[in-house]
Amino acid sequence: QRQMCIRDSVNREPWMQNARFIDNFKIRASYGMLGNNNVALYRYQTIIDNSGNEIVNGNPDLTWEKVKILDAGVDLSLFGQKLEVTFDWFRKVTDDMIVNVPSTPSSGLLAAPMNVGKAEVKGYEIGVGFNHSFTKDIDFSINLGYSYNKSKWLEITNDELINGNTIYRKGHAIKEYYGYQADHLLTQDDLDFRVPIIGGYDGATTAQLPGDIRYVDTNGDKVITTDDRVPLGDQDPHSVYYGNLSFRWKNLDFDMQVNGVGYVPIFYQGLISNPLDPEYGGTPQRWHLDHWKAENPDRNAKLPRVTTDPGNNALLSTFWKENGAFVRIKYMQLGYNFKALAKKIHA
């Protein structure tokens, strides 16, 4: 572990002495390098069950992830420390990132952890706080914070790795969803005109029927295969924010905290995408009424045809993609201090 830090209290400089409303003005920068311990334990070991079967494929050649962090920031306090502002810009580069790399299907081996490349995360954080006692009976405090970060691979083995519905690709986010682009629902006309579908049109039956999700043939080979999958978005939100509010009036006090995240893709699964699955109760809900029906074949229905085996309709695709941004009240508390009343009772 190595670290270097530089800071300067600007408000102590002679040319700042007349700015009396500034209580503290600090500029700082730091750079450090360390090994990353935020990874699963014993990844170098192969684990077997009681029957002698491998359930975790280890890698004895694993090395430490090496993290280099550059941070620059400003701390500002004003008006008798009533208003405080902090700002940080950071860049974190991780060498020898550990990723579970899938083996070829023919090998029959489990995915094994490997050091596959170099990744970068950079962004900024800002916090603003205000607190003031207006009178002996009234106190008020509020703190707001926002952070933004974005990741990308700088280097990775073979420029990309695919593990299930996750893709690791050079120049893209560290972990991205990997699936199909959806283009409404299939109609009988689509099949009559032989639009690209999963499995093609060999044989008397097809793998997809009217009411199934129509997927985009991104590589233009006239059939839908796993090669048509594309990145569908970063698995981690770029924006995170929070707020704390505190207020007191005499013996009455109020506290509240909110937090949330900006845009992040989420995908409907389980009961929503497969209402007849017994694992989730097997009972359709009210929102399933707007599904594709043979008597009303709407290509823009909210849900595909309902079936006990959704098959290809359950694939990860933009059809099930939604915006996962949210704001929530983490807690809210209203209190009353009976200290004065307790003194009277005690007296």
Give residue spans per PLM region.
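Extracytoplasmic gating/loop element in the C-terminal half of outer-membrane beta-barrel translocons
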Residues: 261-347
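Surface-exposed extracellular loop regions of Gram-negative outer-membrane beta-barrel proteins
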Residues: 20-65, 91-115, 154-157, 163-165
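Transmembrane beta-barrel strands of outer-membrane/channel proteins
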Residues: 27-33, 44, 85-91, 142-148, ...
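Outer-membrane beta-barrel signature, preferentially recognizing the C-terminal barrel domain
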Residues: 44-85, 111-135, 171-179, 234-239
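Transmembrane beta-barrel architecture of outer-membrane proteins
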Residues: 10, 31-33, 66-70, 89-95, ...
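Short, small-residue-biased leader/transition segments that mark boundaries at the very start
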Residues: 2-6
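Short loop/turn motifs that connect adjacent beta-strands in outer-membrane beta-barrel proteins
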Residues: 10-25, 79-82, 133-140, 153-158, ...
